[in-house]
Amino acid sequence: MSIFTPTNQIRLTNVAVVRARRAGKRFEIACYRNKVMGWRSGAEKDIDEVLQTHTVFVNVSKGQVAKKEDLVRAFGTDDQTEICKVILSKGELQVSDKERQTQLEQMFRDIATIVADKCVNPETKRPYTVILIERAMKDIHYSVKPNKSTKQQALEVIRQLKETMQIERAHMRLRFILPVKEGKKLKEKLKPLIKVIENEDFHDQLEIVCLIDPGCFREIDELIRSETKGKGTLEVLSLKDVEEGDEKLE
């Protein structure tokens, strides 16, 4: 699709239209065809790489620009860039059935790849292959949600797969070095957030090497910072605790 806008007659090519309805009105934005899904998945963060123009239209193909009063009524603002972001995130991408199916298949593969990268079999500590995760997702009839990021959906998939197979997030290995004064008290607060304590050394300071669920990292980091007034240290030894070697579970 190619269009001319009536204001500046700039020719727009490779256009993907995202449409939303608000307050009884239709609003559209012109995007680069291959960038919309990247924005929604979080892979693309530069809005200028996604939008062909920071203009909200009533009809992109005819170049009809939305009226300011309609924008304010529907979105509560006339900031076109912010409105574009809302439409980009929540609107419906206008594509052919074939294009939509291709995009959904790509998102399905991307979700499976994230799950395979982040998870292991808890008994063997071996990672799963992407092919096996794809097969498991099909077995639970997982349906891709085009308006949600692949990372969010990967977390959903992990939760659902736990009901049918041995799978869990690979643990992170951390080292804490804590001042003696706060060490014992802080250790008790950290215990519920720790999966396994692998090593503990208590001399001039308390040093702990442990495994945690990645979802607890931020809470642990904030707890150590606040309780030690910045005197404690937290070191990530490995992002994924997996068995060494090339073997993967098929």
From Swiss-Prot:
- Superkingdom classification of source: Eukaryota
N-acetylserine-modified residues are where?
A: S2
Q: Which UniProt keywords apply?
A: Acetylation, Cytoplasm, Cytoskeleton, Nucleus, Ribosome biogenesis
Which biological process annotations from GO are given for this protein? bone marrow development; bone mineralization; cytosolic ribosome assembly; hematopoietic progenitor cell differentiation; leukocyte chemotaxis; mitotic spindle organization; rRNA processing
Q: Does the keyword Cytoplasm apply?
A: yes
Query: Could you tell me which cysteines form disulfide bridges?
Result: none
Q: Where in the cell is it found?
A: Cytoplasm; Nucleus, Nucleolus; Nucleus, Nucleoplasm; Cytoplasm, Cytoskeleton, Spindle
InterPro entries the record matches:
Ribosome_mat_SBDS_CS, Ribosome_mat_SBDS_N_sf, Sdo1/SBDS, Sdo1/SBDS-like, SDO1/SBDS_C, SDO1/SBDS_central, Sdo1/SBDS_central_sf, SDO1/SBDS_N
GO MF terms listed in the record are: microtubule binding; ribosome binding; rRNA binding
What GO CC annotations are associated with the protein?
Answer: cytosol; nucleolus; nucleoplasm; spindle pole
Question: Pfam families of this UniProt entry?
Answer: SBDS_C (PF20268), SBDS_domain_II (PF09377), SBDS_N (PF01172)
How is the subunit organization of this protein annotated in UniProt? Associates with the 60S ribosomal subunit.
Say what the protein does. Required for the assembly of mature ribosomes and ribosome biogenesis. Together with EFL1, triggers the GTP-dependent release of EIF6 from 60S pre-ribosomes in the cytoplasm, thereby activating ribosomes for translation competence by allowing 80S ribosome assembly and facilitating EIF6 recycling to the nucleus, where it is required for 60S rRNA processing and nuclear export. Required for normal levels of protein synthesis. May play a role in cellular stress resistance. May play a role in cellular response to DNA damage. May play a role in cell proliferation.
- Into which family does the record put it? Belongs to the SDO1/SBDS family.
Which protein are we looking at? Ribosome maturation protein SBDS
